[in-house]
Amino acid sequence: MTELKQTGTFRKWWKKLRDERARALVAARLNRLAYGLAGDAEPVGDGISELRIHYGPGYRVYYQQRGATIIVLLCGGDKGSQAKDIETAKRLAAEWKE
């Protein structure tokens, strides 16, 4: 199982996510990701990938794999905030320190 790490930005997004079904779906996808099963995920540049959850507004979680660690959870959002979220994820990945 791969170690998943979170940024503060992701934790804030997660705390604001009130839809219980959405939380369950995102949590299930992250669990599968930890076991190497990304499912519907696409690269968005700079080594960042977008995990797509087809529910509600189209939730997105951005992550980057570094060796045996996945820095998840750079940030999260939905289809409406996608462009801004991708830029935020790229910035957070560049700033990430172990």
Feature roles, as predicted:
Residues 6:
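Local sequence-structure signature of Cys/Sec-based thiol-disulfide redox active-site neighborhoods
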Residues 9:
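Residue-level recognition of oxygen-bearing side chains
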